């Protein structure tokens, strides 16, 4: 792995630290490497949760590396199989990802965080999509994912003017899950990751699958869809060993031992 990415395995939790001075900006090469990391995480049966963060205390990521852009890297360059930053276009990742946002998350950096399932941010974090001021658009998920979270008026202001949103405002709008001090950020993200590990892996996979496939459906149609047998994880979890283990462990007043089958 390159010097730009530091990987740490803590049991079933993978920590990924983006380290590209000065702003943790991402060029196509780094994006490819991040994609390899996330795809390996997806396919590794021993890993359950990933945490992505940035090195330092100022930048989570400034997004696309404008120095690379100035040197000829195109906005529509090939950023790898996972899309920009390796995660924004992985649509079959049924394991949770936590973005531990340690500072500015601008442009593609914000889009990377939005592609995660949870955002825990430091109180000095700030979020923005300034692409329109650079003559481009936030097409690595920002213009697609943010409208699913925020009202149109707020989205329009952010994507058309590049307005920044601070940590507390992001919490009020439900963009982030938690706001903590910089010193507590990684411990808090790890605590959340462990809570996820404590849940059954097949259940987590089924939940992500259901969210992904039914989010645009009316409730009645979604009911029919999930019961039609076309989903991979949902039918499996209903007849799994874990579905037996959970109630049994509860009755026996012990922690469940998940097998993922």
UniProtKB/Swiss-Prot annotation:
Enzyme class per UniProt: lyase
Involved pathway(s): Amine and polyamine metabolism; carnitine metabolism
EC number of the protein: 4.2.1.149
Coiled coil regions in record: none
Protein's UniProt keywords contain Lyase: yes
Keywords for the protein's UniProt record, in alphabetical order: Lyase
Presence of keyword Lyase: yes
A GO molecular function held by the record: hydro-lyase activity
A Gene Ontology biological process term: carnitine metabolic process
Pfam family, one: ECH_1
Known catalytic reactions: (R)-carnitinyl-CoA = crotonobetainyl-CoA + H2O
Family annotation (InterPro entries): Carnitinyl_CoA_dehydratase, ClpP/crotonase-like_dom_sf, Enoyl-CoA_hyd/isom_CS, Enoyl-CoA_hydra/iso, Enoyl-CoA_hydra_C
Active site: 111, 131
UniProt cross-references to PANTHER family, sorted A to Z: ENOYL-COA HYDRATASE, MITOCHONDRIAL, ENOYL-COA HYDRATASE-RELATED
Protein function: Catalyzes the reversible dehydration of L-carnitinyl-CoA to crotonobetainyl-CoA.
Family to which the UniProt record says this protein belongs: Belongs to the enoyl-CoA hydratase/isomerase family.
Protein name: Carnitinyl-CoA dehydratase
Species annotation: Escherichia coli O6:H1 (strain CFT073 / ATCC 700928 / UPEC)
Designated gene of the protein: caiD
């Amino acid at each position: 792995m390159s010097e730009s990415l530091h990987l740490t395995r803590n049991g079933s939790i993978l920590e990924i630290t983006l380290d590209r001075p000065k702003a943790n900006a991402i060029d196509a090469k780094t994006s490819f490497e991040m994609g390899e990391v996330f795809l390996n995480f997806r396919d590794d049966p021993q890993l359950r949760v990933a945490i992505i963060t940035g090195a330092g205390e100022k930048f989570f990521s400034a997004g696309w590396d404008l120095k690379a852009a100035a040197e000829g890297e195109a906005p529509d360059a090939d950023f790898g199989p996972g899309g920009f930053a390796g995660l924004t276009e992985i649509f079959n990742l049924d394991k949770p990802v936590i973005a531990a946002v340690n500072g500015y998350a601008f442009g593609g950096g914000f889009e990377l965080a939005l592609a995660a399932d949870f955002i825990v941010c430091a109180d000095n974090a700030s979020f923005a999509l300034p692409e329109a001021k650079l003559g481009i658009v936030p097409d690595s998920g920002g213009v697609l994912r943010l409208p699913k979270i925020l009202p149109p008026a707020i989205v329009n202001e952010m994507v058309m003017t590049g307005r920044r949103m601070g940590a507390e405002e992001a919490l009020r709008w439900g963009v982030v899950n938690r706001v903590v001090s910089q010193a507590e950020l990684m411990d808090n993200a790890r605590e959340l990751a462990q809570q996820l590990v404590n849940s059954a892996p097949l259940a987590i996979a089924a939940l992500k699958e259901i969210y992904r496939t039914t989010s645009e459906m009316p409730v009645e149609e979604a009911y029919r869809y999930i019961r039609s047998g076309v989903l991979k994880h949902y039918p499996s979890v209903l007849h799994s060993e874990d579905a037996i283990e959970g109630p049994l462990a509860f009755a026996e007043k012990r922690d469940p031992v998940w097998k993922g089958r």
